[in-house]
Amino acid sequence: ERNALPADVSLSESTERTATLDIASRELKDFWKGEGRVLLRVSKDGVMRDGFTICRKGLDVELSSASDNGVLYAAYDLLRRQQAGDLLSDGVAVTERPSYDIRILNHWDNPDGTVERGYAGRSIWKWDELPETVSPLYEEYARANASVGINAVVLNNVNAKPQMLSTGMLRKVAVIAEVLRPYGIRTYLSVNFASPKALGELSP
């Protein structure tokens, strides 16, 4: 349930504001129920890559990482602990490190909206509406993935259509990537190696 009044969340003095940290702050302001302050810190001395540390000091909590993405993952971890009734005791710190650097989802979605071996309806990507219309589901998708540490996604079927590398489709892909990027998610495409021939009308 969203808070009626925003929680007390701030960045450390040495931490620069970014789109990713804005998301972490917003999530905590909306859903953190703790009475104390939450401090977000990005430090080069912190846990490497996307790892993070959560430290409880009285009523206050500090989330720290070597990266913005790590702080975002820490925010989601803190909210998950709150939901599960597993909050840290005073003076206790917990450190988490992902086992894999790339944690990727691979879609088997086609440009026409069908999904190869798909059993849950049509593709979430509305290629016919992009780039003019951007579904709010894209950000919810990014949010859900970031909350469990997913940091990469392949948008299309491994049996790729050449048109995925057309100028028009790449403009649409760029719009999706722009939505996913602040959530720490990199965008990938499967490619058909005959695309230059198919799109450029090259002879063999």
Predicted segments with their positions:
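Acidic, contiguous N-terminal accessory segments
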Residues: 1-58, 66, 88-93
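Feature activates predominantly on carbohydrate-active enzymes
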Residues: 27, 46-204
